């Protein structure tokens, strides 16, 4: 059997209390990397002990074997349990080949509103439905109350980091794309516009920044499409790295073999196009690189936290090359998941609760009046406008959170904010930036 942690027991207690309150369909929120699969396995094991049959539904094939291994390790009774991919289970339900369960457990339950999941749920109206997710939110802002009666909330990401259940992280950010070219399609950026927003030189930038900040670390790179994923993998191979590209067209056996090679170190750079996010469990993955701009909070959290599985003395590296933090903040930002569940997102997407220090470029939470790194006083600051970044290099400013990049020369700067950043990178005083701003006509 697997020994659960205190917060996992608390989560199970919350589920049982919700069931005692006559809720039959319950969503359970717990952060990525918090051990949802272990918690699920204990829920199933306890149900089996009471002779209850449990059906567990997952949305990707490689997760079937991953979850099944955990279930076996926790002594789940396979005579009363079944784990399967949603499409497979749905087809079997239509044919009447699934024995009625007492409980339906859904992994990554933010997908559960789709037709295939509903077909399964509706086929067994008397069953309890327990859906686990790290991100109870939808791209269109609608909630989940049309399917679930209640939500049980787990510990926050900050709590898990502070209590050594998730690894702390260092967030490095640059902006290598032209955001003006990004166009929306069904609430998300279209693939065509993403491709147009990227400069071809980005593939070299990915390698350069990896070697500068994460060289030797096992890394997952989230590319924006299959072609870009292949190009990035090839760029790394040319430099002698053990890199491999995978996408949804790869056969199941190939995907499982590649994942195992990544786990045991035969592959150290894994590039993919939206394939390895949810539920992909590799504790020794130390770095993720984001090459896919997204307005999906769920996708952002799933990808950024893939490197935050806990190991002693580990610090995850998150390299954001598309400025996703400016939309979604940071992995451990406070979020009111109850409001998301109810379909009442707490604020507009454009209103972020982090800010950038104009003196040292550290990115901190907005409620801080003084920069903890350089002591800059925000109460006397004049608000600047947002800016785009071109021809830049990553530079580490602080031990954690986001580090922005520096410009090459004054003539490339389009605002005083950019000039002050350049001055900082050159170790010049702010007065130099002011003088350059006068020359460039940025100050009247």
What label would you give each PLM region?
Residues 269-272, 278-293, 316-320:
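A short beta-strand element within the Helicase C-terminal
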Residues 307-332:
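Conserved segment of the helicase C-terminal RecA-like domain
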Residues 64-100:
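Inter-Walker segment of RecA-like/P-loop motor cores
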Residues 65-69, 231, 242-273:
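Conserved helicase ATPase core of P-loop NTP-dependent helicases/translocases
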Residues 1-27:
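Conserved pre-motif I regulatory segment
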Residues 111-171:
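Post-DEXD/H (motif II) to motif III coupling segment of the RecA-like Helicase ATP-binding lobe
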Residues 151-220:
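Conserved interdomain linker/interface between the two RecA-like ATPase lobes of SF2 helicase motors
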Residues 22-43:
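Walker A/P-loop
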């Amino acid at each position: 059997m697997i020994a659960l942690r205190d917060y996992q027991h608390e989560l199970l207690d919350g589920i049982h209390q919700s069931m005692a309150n006559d809720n039959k369909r319950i969503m359970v929120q717990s952060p990525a990397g918090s051990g949802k699969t272990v918690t699920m396995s204990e829920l199933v094991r306890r149900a089996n002990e009471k002779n209850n049959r449990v059906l567990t539904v997952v949305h990707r094939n490689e997760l079937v074997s991953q979850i099944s291994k955990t279930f076996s390790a926790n002594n789940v009774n396979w005579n009363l349990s079944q784990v399967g991919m949603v499409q497979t289970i749905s087809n079997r339900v239509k044919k009447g080949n699934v024995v009625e369960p007492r409980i339906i457990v859904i992994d990554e339950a933010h997908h559960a509103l789709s037709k295939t999941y509903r077909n399964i749920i509706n086929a067994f109206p008397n069953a309890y439905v327990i859906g686990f997710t790290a991100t109870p939110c939808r791209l269109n802002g609608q909630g989940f109350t049309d399917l679930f009666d209640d939500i049980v909330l787990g510990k926050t990401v900050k709590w898990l980091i502070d209590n050594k259940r998730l690894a702390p992280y260092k967030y490095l950010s640059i902006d290598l794309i032209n955001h003006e070219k990004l166009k929306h399609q069904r609430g998300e950026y279209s693939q065509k516009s993403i491709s147009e927003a990227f400069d071809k030189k980005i593939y070299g930038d990915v390698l350069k920044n990896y070697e500068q900040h994460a060289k030797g670390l096992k890394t997952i790179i989230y590319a924006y499409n299959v072609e870009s994923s292949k190009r990035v993998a090839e760029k790394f191979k040319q430099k002698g790295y053990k890199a491999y590209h995978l996408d949804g067209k790869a056969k199941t056996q190939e995907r499982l073999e590649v994942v195992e090679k990544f786990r045991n170190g035969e592959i150290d750079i894994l590039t993919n196009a939206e394939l390895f996010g949810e539920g992909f469990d590799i504790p020794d993955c130390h770095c993720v690189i984001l090459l896919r701009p997204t307005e999906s909070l769920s996708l952002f959290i799933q990808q950024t936290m893939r490197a935050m599985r806990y190991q002693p003395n580990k610090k995850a590296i998150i390299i954001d090359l598309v400025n996703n933090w400016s939309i979604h903040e940071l992995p451990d930002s406070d979020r009111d998941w109850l409001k998301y569940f109810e379909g009442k997102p707490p604020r507009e997407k454009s209103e972020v609760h982090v800010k950038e220090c104009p003196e040292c470029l550290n990115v901190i939470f907005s409620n801080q009046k003084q920069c903890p790194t350089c002591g800059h006083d925000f109460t006397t600051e004049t608000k600047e406008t947002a800016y785009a970044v071109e021809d830049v290099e990553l530079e580490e400013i602080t031990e954690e959170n986001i580090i922005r990049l520096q410009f090459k020369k004054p003539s490339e700067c389009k605002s005083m904010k950019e000039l002050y950043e350049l001055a900082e990178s050159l170790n010049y005083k702010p007065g130099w930036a002011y003088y350059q701003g006068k020359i460039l006509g940025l100050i009247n």
